[in-house]
């Protein structure tokens, strides 16, 4: 009989408990995944009790309060606090989202916070985005043209052509969608994932780009594109309300047209 063995230090253990101090009018417990790869120790779940009446309304506000007032070693990324930069992407209450726009009041019970799933962890809630960014670079996410740039002018397009980019250019590369996708979990080394494919379609759909055929050929691969099985987790979890699954479908349709299907 085959014996199943977990990787070393993969079992998550109970960590420290930080009790609230003083008078508390609105107590909530926040459970945070803690892991430092420089230490030869298992990850833990640390618990923090905070008074929500003394913090802001978003999960990120609670994290900042914990870091500033309780445990300065808690590590996470954040920047804009407006849902624009994508830095604070993490798994909150079982769903990938942005901590800065996730209201605490929408979560019942203890607030459980983990890093984005199926990515290596740099520390605590900080995932290693290196592979994700390398995949983004591979699609050449810039305007590719054969004609010289106009002098003292922009490359113009019609209002109708510009509208084709709506729902695409707004992607902030937070990776919430890709890390919610089982196909990306299983084949992340080869499958580009919903975020990168949506970005690829953004340039394919741009009327100013002259290399549509080249871009489609680069994606016509059993793994890069066709590992998408329309599970739809990507569309469900996108904090910007975008539809990566639709973009992937559009790419597949354009490739089929090229083959006369």
Curated annotation (Swiss-Prot):
Q: What is its EC number?
A: 1.3.5.1
Q: Which InterPro entries match?
A: 2Fe-2S_ferredoxin-like_sf, 2Fe-2S_ferredoxin-type, 2Fe2S_fd_BS, 4Fe4S_Fe-S-bd, 4Fe4S_Fe_S_CS, Beta-grasp_dom_sf, Helical_ferredxn, SDH/FRD_Iron-Sulfur
UniProt keyword Lipid metabolism, yes or no: no
Q: Which residues make up the binding site for a ubiquinone?
A: 186
Q: Where is the 2Fe-2S ferredoxin-type domain?
A: 28-119
Q: Where is the 4Fe-4S ferredoxin-type domain?
A: 161-191
Q: Which residues bind [4Fe-4S] cluster?
A: 171, 174, 177, 238
Its Gene Ontology biological processes?
A: respiratory electron transport chain; tricarboxylic acid cycle
Q: Which cofactor does it need?
A: [2Fe-2S] cluster; [3Fe-4S] cluster; [4Fe-4S] cluster
Binding sites annotated in the UniProt record for [3Fe-4S] cluster: 181, 228, 234
For molecular function, the Gene Ontology terms on record are:
2 iron, 2 sulfur cluster binding; 3 iron, 4 sulfur cluster binding; 4 iron, 4 sulfur cluster binding; electron transfer activity; metal ion binding; succinate dehydrogenase (quinone) activity
Q: Look up the domain of life of the source.
A: Bacteria
Q: Which residues bind [2Fe-2S] cluster?
A: 80, 85, 100
How the cofactor is bound: the record states:
Binds 1 [2Fe-2S] cluster.
Q: Which Gene3D superfamilies match?
A: 3.10.20.30, Alpha-helical ferredoxin (1.10.1060.10)
Keywords of the record, alphabetical order, are: 2Fe-2S, 3Fe-4S, 4Fe-4S, Electron transport, Iron, Iron-sulfur, Metal-binding, Oxidoreductase, Transport, Tricarboxylic acid cycle
Q: In which pathway does it act?
A: Carbohydrate metabolism; tricarboxylic acid cycle; fumarate from succinate (bacterial route): step 1/1
Q: Which reactions appear under catalytic activity for this entry?
A: a quinone + succinate = fumarate + a quinol
Which proteins does it associate with, and in what oligomeric form?
Part of an enzyme complex containing four subunits: a flavoprotein, an iron-sulfur, cytochrome b-556, and a hydrophobic anchor protein.
Family assignment from sequence similarity: Belongs to the succinate dehydrogenase/fumarate reductase iron-sulfur protein family.
Annotated protein name in UniProt: Succinate dehydrogenase iron-sulfur subunit
Q: Which gene encodes it?
A: sdhB
């Amino acid at each position: 009989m085959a014996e199943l063995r977990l990787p070393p230090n993969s079992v998550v253990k109970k960590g420290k408990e930080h009790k609230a101090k003083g008078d508390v009018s609105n107590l909530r417990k926040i459970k945070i995944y803690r892991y430092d790869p420089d230490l030869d120790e298992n990850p833990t779940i640390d618990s923090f009790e905070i008074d929500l009446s003394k913090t802001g309304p978003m999960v990120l506000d609670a994290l900042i309060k914990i870091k500033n007032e309780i445990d300065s070693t808690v590590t996470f990324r954040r920047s804009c606090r407006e849902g624009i930069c994508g830095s604070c992407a993490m798994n909150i209450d079982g769903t990938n989202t942005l901590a800065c726009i996730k209201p605490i009041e929408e979560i019942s019970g203890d607030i459980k916070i983990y890093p984005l799933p199926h990515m290596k962890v740099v520390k605590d809630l900080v995932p290693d985005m290196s592979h994700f960014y390398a995949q983004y670079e591979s699609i050449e996410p810039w305007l590719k043209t054969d004609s010289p740039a106009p002098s003292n002018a922009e490359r113009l397009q019609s209002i109708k052509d510009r509208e084709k980019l709506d729902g695409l250019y707004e992607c902030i590369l937070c990776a919430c969608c890709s890390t919610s996708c089982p196909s990306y979990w299983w084949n992340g080394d080869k499958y580009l994932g919903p975020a990168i494919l949506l970005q690829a379609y953004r340039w394919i759909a741009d009327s100013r780009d002259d290399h549509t055929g080249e871009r489609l050929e680069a994606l016509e691969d059993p793994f890069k594109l066709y590992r998408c099985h329309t599970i739809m987790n990507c569309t469900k979890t996108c904090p910007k309300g975008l539809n990566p699954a639709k973009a992937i479908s559009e790419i597949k349709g354009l490739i089929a047209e090229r083959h006369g299907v």
